[in-house]
């Protein structure tokens, strides 16, 4: 996907012909005969994916005319799928941050279903929301001092006054990270995240929101990126028309940087 900031650095580096490039052709994330792989290839070719019957199938679609109804369905489904306590099994992805099916509203809704407030549950404020013990959170800035980085996913295990302690699964057992009052803003709820934020990650089960109000982001490369994050199952919630819009839209916004041309002018081969 294009970078959130200016330019298109990696694409320009490849286009310049001055950088060594390796193309990965073998799929290891999903089984070779997985419907996810088959549909990813179809999406890449500009064809509609084939949806299997039943929300629990390997590649399914649940349609809703009302976007808030779609968001509520996602929250209920997420709660059912993680009722056994495996909070890392499911990840909700969505193209945008705003609207009923955006990251912000979905995280508030999912928190209400999964980790509601109670009289004996401590919480601490973060921009636009609160954190409670048990919440799934994401580090949103690189913090070299704490050895945690943008995109790391963890779970709040303790709140002591204004301090928040988070367990990150990739760290050794007991090697927790504590955030003081001024550092808590480095965290945000992570029940739902943007497709951009999910790049490079994988999850057993992906629930993807695809609705028409996100039309500005409905592009083929975004849909392809989202469904290929899943190892076992994909559930798309929203509108088949939104999926079709994304499949048929292979035009990415042109970015003018001259980086490729500058690299081509260089006599050095990297």
Show which residues each predicted segment covers.
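Conserved helicase motor core of P-loop NTPases
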Residues: 1-146, 157
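Conserved flavin/dinucleotide-binding core of flavoenzymes
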Residues: 149
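C-terminal accessory regions
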Residues: 152-270
């Amino acid at each position: 996907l294009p970078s959130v900031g200016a330019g298109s650095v990696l694409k320009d580096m490849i286009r310049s012909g001055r950088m060594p490039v390796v193309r990965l052709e073998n799929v290891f994330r999903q089984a070779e005969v997985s419907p996810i792989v088959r549909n990813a290839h179809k999406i890449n070719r500009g064809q509609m994916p084939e949806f299997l019957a039943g929300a629990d199938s390997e590649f399914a679609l649940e349609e809703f005319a009302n976007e808030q109804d779609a968001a509520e369905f996602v929250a209920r489904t997420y709660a059912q799928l993680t009722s056994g306590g495996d909070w890392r099994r499911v990840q909700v992805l969505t193209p945008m941050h705003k609207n009923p099916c955006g990251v912000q509203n979905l995280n508030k809704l999912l928190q209400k279903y999964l980790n509601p407030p109670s009289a004996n549950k401590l919480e601490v404020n973060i921009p636009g929301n609160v954190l409670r013990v048990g919440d799934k959170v994401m580090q949103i800035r690189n913090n070299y001092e704490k050895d945690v980085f943008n995109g790391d996913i963890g779970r709040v295990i303790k709140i002591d006054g204004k301090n928040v302690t988070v367990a990150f699964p990739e760290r050794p057992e007991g090697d927790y990270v504590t955030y003081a009052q001024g550092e808590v803003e480095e965290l945000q709820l992570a029940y739902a995240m943007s497709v951009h934020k999910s790049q490079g990650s994988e999850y057993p089960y992906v629930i993807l929101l695809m609705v028409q109000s996100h039309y500005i982001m409905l592009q083929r490369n975004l849909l392809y990126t989202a469904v290929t994050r899943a190892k076992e199952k994909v559930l798309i919630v929203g509108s088949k028309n939104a999926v079709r819009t994304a499949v048929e839209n292979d035009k990415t916004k042109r970015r003018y940087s001259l980086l490729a041309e500058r690299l081509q002018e260089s006599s050095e081969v990297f």
